[in-house]
């Protein structure tokens, strides 16, 4: 029925998943036959697409986009994100549209154009002209110069007003009719600023999110699922990254990033245990806590109570360091729970890797 709403000679049916590489994975179908659109839609709905960004499990298609085919003359790439060196917004552009920008940067870095934007001044016309001339739009198609510069200004406004982490158009096309069209776009938002943007939150598609990450968010935990077999529970993002690094050095792979924050109370630890144990890949759990503001004996009590509440069926290693760490380790050792206690990070990592086996 929706095909009848489009007056076009070419129909494009696109799978809507939060990953790139859909075309190569068979997630984009093109037809000139209006009657064939429904069949293509049925073929894609429910299909699992495996791309270089989905991981081996892939993502199931729950939503589709039907749009008009475009008369493509030239494909470009355009995005805006935060430059980590300067802390300023930076536009990234390339004449190699339609490709993964990481691949372009690796193989032909000279084709990557960057334009920093001073946030104290904001986007200016000269910023747009710098990028437009660097792309060669003045020779490729002068008619699109002004619309392109206006589009850059709109992207900058979207990026700043909605607290985006990245806005990407790939490909940005110049049609044979001498118009400029954003053929595909992605916007990533800063999770920490979402409370300011109810309109953005309403667009959230839980089908595209990891169920365990949704559960973690509901418990105020920072959780990212990974592909390893050792579940990590840590307080502090920096310590969490160091923990993942040392697990790799010891010969295995982390199953997640899980930051329980500064509290590490019975409730947060219990929620963390439940989330980790729902992952069938987890063969062991490594708790690595540094007691700074929160004393280690309080953390130990939280771990003990949570472990009694949640049935733990895999090896557990707990490393405590910081304020009253010795008292905390003593409480754990005398708790009667089946766990290993350590004070040294490398020793603890080696213990959990030995108990779970090295990664294949």
Regions found by a protein language model. Give the residues of each.
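ATP-dependent carboxylate/acyl-activation modules
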Residues: 1-169, 173-287, 297-299, 308, ...
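Catalytic core of bacterial c-di-GMP phosphodiesterases, primarily the EAL and HD-GYP domains
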Residues: 292
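Short amphipathic alpha-helix used as the core "switch/output" element in two-component signaling
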Residues: 304-305
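Short internal beta-strands
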Residues: 313-322
